[in-house]
Amino acid sequence: MSSWGDSLKISVFGESHGKGIGVVIDGLPAGVRLDMEGIYLQMSRRAPGKDKTATPRLEKDIPQVLSGLLDNTTTGAPLCAVIENTNTRSGDYGNIMSCPRPGHADYTGNIRYGGFNDISGGGHFSGRLTAPIVFAGSVCRQILAEKGIRIAAHIASIGNVNDIRFDPVDIPSELIDRLNVSTFALIDQSAEEKMRAEVEQCRMNLDSIGGTVECAVTGLPAGVGSPMFYGIEGVISSIVFGIPAVKGIEFGAGFDAAKMKGSQDNDEFYYDGDTVRTRTNNHGGILGGISSGMPVIFRAALKPTPSIGKQQNTVDLVKHQDAKLEIHGRHDPCIVPRAVPVIESAAAVAVANLMMQVNKL
Amino acid sequence: MSSWGDSLKISVFGESHGKGIGVVIDGLPAGVRLDMEGIYLQMSRRAPGKDKTATPRLEKDIPQVLSGLLDNTTTGAPLCAVIENTNTRSGDYGNIMSCPRPGHADYTGNIRYGGFNDISGGGHFSGRLTAPIVFAGSVCRQILAEKGIRIAAHIASIGNVNDIRFDPVDIPSELIDRLNVSTFALIDQSAEEKMRAEVEQCRMNLDSIGGTVECAVTGLPAGVGSPMFYGIEGVISSIVFGIPAVKGIEFGAGFDAAKMKGSQDNDEFYYDGDTVRTRTNNHGGILGGISSGMPVIFRAALKPTPSIGKQQNTVDLVKHQDAKLEIHGRHDPCIVPRAVPVIESAAAVAVANLMMQVNKL
Amino acid sequence: MSSWGDSLKISVFGESHGKGIGVVIDGLPAGVRLDMEGIYLQMSRRAPGKDKTATPRLEKDIPQVLSGLLDNTTTGAPLCAVIENTNTRSGDYGNIMSCPRPGHADYTGNIRYGGFNDISGGGHFSGRLTAPIVFAGSVCRQILAEKGIRIAAHIASIGNVNDIRFDPVDIPSELIDRLNVSTFALIDQSAEEKMRAEVEQCRMNLDSIGGTVECAVTGLPAGVGSPMFYGIEGVISSIVFGIPAVKGIEFGAGFDAAKMKGSQDNDEFYYDGDTVRTRTNNHGGILGGISSGMPVIFRAALKPTPSIGKQQNTVDLVKHQDAKLEIHGRHDPCIVPRAVPVIESAAAVAVANLMMQVNKL
Amino acid sequence: MSSWGDSLKISVFGESHGKGIGVVIDGLPAGVRLDMEGIYLQMSRRAPGKDKTATPRLEKDIPQVLSGLLDNTTTGAPLCAVIENTNTRSGDYGNIMSCPRPGHADYTGNIRYGGFNDISGGGHFSGRLTAPIVFAGSVCRQILAEKGIRIAAHIASIGNVNDIRFDPVDIPSELIDRLNVSTFALIDQSAEEKMRAEVEQCRMNLDSIGGTVECAVTGLPAGVGSPMFYGIEGVISSIVFGIPAVKGIEFGAGFDAAKMKGSQDNDEFYYDGDTVRTRTNNHGGILGGISSGMPVIFRAALKPTPSIGKQQNTVDLVKHQDAKLEIHGRHDPCIVPRAVPVIESAAAVAVANLMMQVNKL
C-alpha cells in the first residue's frame, strides 16, 4: 500500500510518466500557517538536474494544493497536493516489460500486478514518487518546528568516502540551518570534492554508486513513543523503507552496538541542570522504543541506482530465454544527495505521528 | 502500542513480574492443525536458563490456550495463549524507579507513563515479553510451512566472533531443519566454542555483549509485498524493532550495498528451467518491496544486554542528583542465542500478513 | 478522518469551493478494465441540477484520473481522481462564521478546527464531497460486478410518501438494471408524482424534507464478513454514516425486528436445489456479521437538508448573542434522490473490502 | 475481526464453552485508578440468571486481570482480563452443526470457517462474548467519568411496550446514577410490570421478544469527532453492531428525521449564559460527525433471541435435506435488559477513542 500513518495519514499516488503524482495528508492540525517557499525549497533539494550526480532530466515539481489550505493555513481538512507530470509516457522504456532491469522492481512488479502495472519510467515504483513524500514531510517539519523539533540529515557516505558523523550529544542549531538548505549536505564540507569525484568516475564508467544518509531529530521531548510495536525505531523504519533503494537502517550505535560490551554501549545518565541527559548517545535517543530527550539518530543504507549504462544479463520474459540488456537514457549515477531531504521528510511524517500519539501535537 | 498487523493481528500483553503474559492472535485462517509440541519447542529455544549464555532464572513457559483452538485445530476465532508468571513481583528491583538503569527503558518508561508503569523486572519492557511473540510466530510458521515457506535464523555474530553467512541463493532444507531445533544456532558450528568463550569472559567481567542474527525466509513466492509502505522490508522491520535490543536491520547486502557500484550490486536474472532466478542475491529477495522468489534475507543488530554487574553512573530521580548504580540479580550476558527464535517468529508473523495481503494465505 | 478501509482504502479530499475535490483509492486489484462511461453515469446521477428536487447550481463533475489507470485498466497503483471546482470561493456565505446555520456543521466544525476550517459552501463538510465517494464506489461496483455482485438502491420514502420495499428474497436483475440508471430511483414508479409534489411544496415553503434510501446487495456469496467488529453491519454502517445527513441505518427487519417475536423474526432455512436459502429475509442477508447468501438489505435515514430559506434563530459567535439567520442561495429541498447513488457507492466500497478480507477479490 | 479501535484498541477473545474469554485493552492512559467493584457491578448487570427475563444458566463472571494494573492503577501497558469458563463444552448442542438454528450464526459461521469453528454454545458468536466488552467499557467509563463524561442507557422498548425517552436536552445526573446500577433500567419504572409480562408470555409460549435500547452520553465537550469517516455516528455504530442481535441504530431523531421538514428537524442555537446550546436535540448531539456539546443520543434495535423452544424448519447440512429443529436448553426470552450495560460499554470504548483523537484523553 502507498498509505502510511495513524493519527496523521499520508496517501501517495502517481506513476512516473502518468498525468500527475501527489499526496493526500489526512489528520493535520488546523490553524498551522505553512511557509510555501520553505516547502518548495525542500522539494527543489530533491529535484533532479542540479549537478552531475543527478539526472539531467528536468522536472518542474511545483505542487498545486487542491485542498486543506486557506491563506496558506491548514484548515484541518485533508491537504491534497498534486504535481503534474510534464514528462509523460514515451517509448524510452519500451523493452522493460520483456527484459526486466536487474536491481529494479520491473520483474517483481510484473508478477505482483500480473503485467498490468505502468512500466514507463518505473511507474509507481519510480524514485519520482519521493517528491510527494518530501511535500508531506515538509509540511510536517514546519508543524514540528513550532514545537522546537528539528530534523536534519547529511550524506554520511558515498561508496567508501565518508563524511564525519553527527556528534550525537550535541547537534548545533547552525549546523541544522546549513544542512536544511544544502543540495549536497555534508557536515565536513571538505568531503564534497572526493565524493563528487567518486560519483563522476562511476558516471564515466556507465556505473552508479550507493551510500548512506545520517539523520538527526533534535528537540524531541523525552517520553514520546511506545514499547514494542509503536516504538520510534519501528515507526521510523516502516516509513523509511518506503523510500526506493533503502536496504538498511540503524539507530544510535546500530550495527556497531552488536560488537560492543554493555559497559561500552550503555549511556550513563547525568543531570545537566534540571535535565536528565546521557554523556554518550549510543542509544540514538531511544530506549525501549521511547525518546530519552537526547537527539534521535539513525542511518539509512541506499543501494546504488540500479539503472546503469553497462550491458547486463537478464531474461526475456516474452521469449522465455536469457537475454542481454543495455539501459539507455539519463540516470542519476548516485541518488544519495537527493535522498537527504527525502529521508528527513519521511522522518518528519513519522515523528508527527509519534507526537500525536502522546497528545503532543 | 503492543498490537501489530492488519490481516492477522497480534496483541501482546503482560508485565515481567505480573500475573501472566500472553498474546491474542486475531485473523488466523480456520482449520489449520497445530503441532503444539512444535510450538513448545520453539518457546523452549527462547526460554532462559539453558546454559551459561543465559540467565539461570527459571521460567516455565508453558502457554495455556484459552480460545481459538479445538482439537488443536484453529477455529478461526481469536487464539489467546497465556503464560502464567511464577516469578512474580519481588523486592529485587526496588531501586530502579529512583535510579534508572543505563541502556534500559527505566527512564523513558518513567516519563512516558508518569511513573505508573510496573518496573519489576522491566515490566512490559522486559525481554520476557518476547515469549508471546514466539508463541504467535510459531503458530504462523506452521501455517506458512503448509505453503512451503520456511524461516530459519542463526547467530551471525557475537561481539567480533562471526558465523559464516547464509549462501543467499541456496539455503538447503537440511540446514533449516537443523537450525530450527538448535538452541545455539550456527551455520558453522565450529564458531560455537569461540562465541561461548567471548560470552563467558563478559560474564566473568560482570559485563555483557551484543551480536547479530541473520534470518532467511525460503519458499516465498515471487509477487508478495507492495511498493512503498507495505514493502517487505518495511513490514518486517516494523515488527522486528518491537524486539527489545534490536537497533538495526538490513536486507540482502544491506549496509554493504551502500559501498557498492551498481554493476556489483545488481543481481542478474536468468532462467533456471522455467523459473526466473538471480545468480546473486544482494537484493535479499526483495525488489521494490516485493518478493522476487529468491530467499528473503535480513540481519538484525542486537545491542548488549544493558543489565550488567559493573557499577555505573546514573541519576537519582527522587533526590534529583547524580548517583551510582550496581545491578544485582542474574542476567543474560548475551541474549543473542535466545533472540534467534524470537526473530524467526517476528518474521513469521510479518510474512503471514504479507501473504494474506495478496490472498495467498 | 476522511480515509476509510483496510484492504482497499479510500482517502477523500477537497472543500466545496476550493480548487478541487477527489479521492485516492489504494489497494485496487490490477488488471480490471473500467467502463469510464459507466462511472460518469453514476456521477451524473448524483450531480445536482437535474430537476426541481435538486439545487440548480451547476457542477461539471468530470473527474480527471491522475494515476492508477492505463488504457482504462487498473495498474494496481493508487488511483487518484480529481474533480476541479469551477464554482470557487465567493462571498455568498460570508455570515456563516459569525452565525452558524442550524442543523449544519458550521458550529461544530468551528469548534473542532478552531475557526480555521474553510466555511465557503460548507467546506469539507459539504455534500459535494460525496462526488468522490461516488467515483470510488463506481469503480468498486464494476469490480464487484465481475464476481456477480450487484448493488441497487431506491428512494424508500420522502417525508411520509413511501415507495414499496424490495422483496428481500427476490430482487430481479431487471429491477437492478433499471434502478442503476435512474435519477429518481423507485421500485413503484407511481410514487414519483406524489414524492415530487411533497418536495415541491417544501420548496415553495422555503423548507426541505428528509427521507430514506433502501439498498440491496445481491450475489454476495455466503461466508463473507466476520463476527464482532468486522461484521457486515458494522463495516457498512461505518462508511454510510460518512455521508452527510445520514442519521440512522437498519439491516433486514431492523427496528421492526425489535417489535417481533423470535418465531416471527427467525428466517427458516430450506434447500433450493443445492443452495441453502431462507424463506423470509428479516436477517437482511447477515447472521453473526456474516453473509448468508441471501440479499444484503439495509435502509438509511436522511434528515432534511438543513439549508432552508425560512428565517431561523441561531447565535452570533462574534457578538456573543442570540441572532436571526436567513439563508439565501439555492439549495436542494430534498437530497434523497441524489443520495441514492451515494449510498450504493458507499456500500460498494464496503463490500469490496469485505470480499478482500476473505480472499474473494 | 474481534479487534476494534485506533488510539485505544480492544481485542476480544474466547468461545462460549472454551477455557476462557477475555479482552486485551491496549493504549490506556497510565495512572488511572480503577474502581474494581464498579467494574464488577457493571459485569453483574450483564450477567444472566437474575430474573425470569434471563437464562437461569449460572455464570461466575469474575474477571482476573493478568496485566496492566498495579494497585488497581493502570500502568499504561496492555490490560488483559480473563474470565474463566466454568460451563465448558458439553453435548447440549450436538445437533447444531448438522442443523443450523434459524436466526443464529450457525450456518454463516459454518461457511465462513469451513466447519472448523467451535459451535458449542455459539462459540465465538455467543452473547457471552459481550462480557469482555462490558469489562473494557467499564474501564473506559471510569476514565471518561474523570473528564465529566457519563454514559447511561435504558430499555426503550420491549416488543410493543415502551419506556419514555430521554429528554434529549436535559438528562439529570440523578437519573444517570439510578440507571447505571439498575438491572432493569427504565426511565419510567412503571413500564417494568408490562414489559415483564410481555417477556413472561413469550417465555411461556417457548418464544422470545426483541426491543430497543436508548443510550445517552453527557458531558462530551463540543468539537469531538471528525467529518466523514471518523464521525461520532460512524465510530459508535461500528462497535455497536459488534454486539450480537443489534440490527439497527439511529442518532438523535434518527428515522423520524426522515419524515421531518428542515424547519422541524433543525435545532436552533441559543446562548445559555456563555454556552452555545440548542433548544431541541434532533441532531442527537452530533453535527457533521462532531459533537455539539449537547447530549449524544442513540437508539439500537435488538432482534429477538433466535433461540426459541418452538419447533422450526431448517436444513440438515449433513443429509443435504430440509429438517425440523427443536432447541432445548435454557435461553433468555429477552436479552434487552442485559444488553443495556453492553451498549453503554460499547459507547464508552467508542467515546474514549474519539476523545483520544482530539487529544482530550
Across the structure, where does each feature detected by a protein language model lie?
Chain A
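N-terminal, positively charged regions that mediate nucleic acid binding
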Residues: M1-R57
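Glycine-rich anion/phosphate-binding loop at the beta-strand->alpha-helix junction
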Residues: F13-K19, L206-D322
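Alpha-helical support elements that line or immediately flank enzyme active sites
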Residues: K19-G31, G127-I149, Y230-S238, M294-T305, ...
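A short glycine/serine-rich beta->alpha loop
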Residues: K9-G14, N117-L129, A222-S226, N281-L287, ...
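Internal helix-turn-beta structural module
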Residues: K9, S307-L361
